[in-house]
């Protein structure tokens, strides 16, 4: 299984010739949906979902997401499946389990649904939340930036989930100086936990089990 990081919050996972894309938002300029078999979308914010790109994608593309996103994709009948906390399903040869219900607290007047996804019991992508799935997580895609996130919360999340490896996501708001800070934070915590925590550059891949 190969994981490739793209702009901001988007990743692409490939296995046995099948392609699964997570959160291809408007910050994602790379053509990540080309050749994709399925898409997982954690929530409705534009940096995680680009409705126009989904509508222009292959009609065979399968989309799994929360009710909030599905409501914006009603003109794609049959392509969109609503997922809720506790659901389990298979798509494009990947086994997926759903965890969580809500976006981390951001604006008090705008609650937003958010679903995290565990893929093949290997990769956990929480979206814009610090959801603890309560299961072993070999690879965590950890949010490292955003108006709803503090450094202390990120570190505590890494220590609670305690993954064997973690890669930065939700880092598209940083300039080069900010990304350097992310690298330092992850390196420091990696040494503390004796684990592999780091940031992948846009287009960089990692081979997983």
What are these regions (language model features)?
Residues 1-4, 77-92, 155, 165-209:
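Binuclear metal-ion centers of metallo-dependent hydrolases, dominated by the metallo-beta-lactamase
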Residues 46, 69-70, 131, 173:
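Alpha-helix capping/helix-boundary segments
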Residues 20-21, 40, 64, 125, ...:
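Structural motif
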Residues 115-188:
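Metallo-beta-lactamase
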Residues 10, 51-55, 70, 154-158, ...:
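Short amphipathic alpha-helical segments and helix-helix/interface helices
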Residues 18, 58-62, 78, 161-165, ...:
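A short helix->loop->beta-strand "cap" motif at the edges of active sites that frequently abuts
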Residues 26-69, 138-141, 162:
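Active-site metal-binding motif and surrounding structural segment of the metallo-beta-lactamase
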Residues 1-34, 82-136, 147-153, 201-209:
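Core dinuclear metal-dependent hydrolase active-site scaffold
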